[in-house]
Each structure stands twice: as structure tokens, then as C-alpha cells.
Amino acid sequence: MIPAGVDITDLAQQLHEDGVAYTNPIHGQDVDLNADVAKGLKDGDGIAVVDVAANRAPDVRDIAQELQDATGLDTVVVQTPQYVSSVSDTYSRADIEAVQPHLAPGLAQNELLNQYYAGLDQISFPVSATVGSVTLIAAIIFVSSYWAAVRR
């Protein structure tokens, strides 16, 4: 549930501009701050700093999901006074949930993004290597079985 006081439309509009959004209008209009934070984002990602108290962490994830749906961004990180949450089309839910507990809500946005991406890059699962290994093992088993059957 989206907490009262969170204007998804306004945040989405800010995210469309430079990938950075604030509920605080002073920060939202600070061009230098937004440009500095935007440098820490990967292409297609966004961050929203929401100065509204959320009662539960899933509410913050709901904000992130609504913003992703409204903007089409690949990954949306939402920082509130109590929680940090995100949704992504690139990173798995399990990887995101492994990183989020290590992100303190009060971090500066650049530091938050550095820790977020570093944590995700560290635990990224090597899909290509795993698929290649499984394929190789399956081929060895197939060839061994074939030769065993031909010899009989």
C-alpha cells in the first residue's frame, strides 16, 4: 500500500527528467544535487527519496513498483527515513533482498547507490558459466552412455 502523502505522478515526472526524484521540493529543484546523484545511477535506473514515513518495508517496495510501472525504468530504488527498497527487471528479487538489509536508510544517495550496485555485482549469479557447465556434463554423460551401449 502506498503511504499517504506520496505523489507517484510527481515522483515519476522527476524520474523521467534525470532518474532522480525527491518528495522534498527544495531537493527536487536542486539541479547540482540531482546531477551529482544521477552520475551514480546505471543507465535505465532511477532513485526516489521519499520523506514520508512508511509503516512497513513492503510499502516502500510498492512505491518502487508503482514508479517503475509509471516510468518504464529498469531498476527503481526508493529511500525513505526507515527503509530502502527496490524493484528491477535486471536483478533478481533474491539478489535485491540480499543487498537491502545492508543499506542504511540515512545514507547519502551516492553512497547508497555505490553500496547497492556493489552488493548486487558481488552476488550476481554466473548464469553463462553454470549453463555451460551443465551442458558439458550432460554431453559427457550422453557420450559415455552411447559408447557403453555400442560396446554391448
Where are these regions (language model features)?
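Active-site phosphate/pyrophosphate- and oxyanion-stabilizing loops and adjacent acidic/basic residues
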Residues: 65
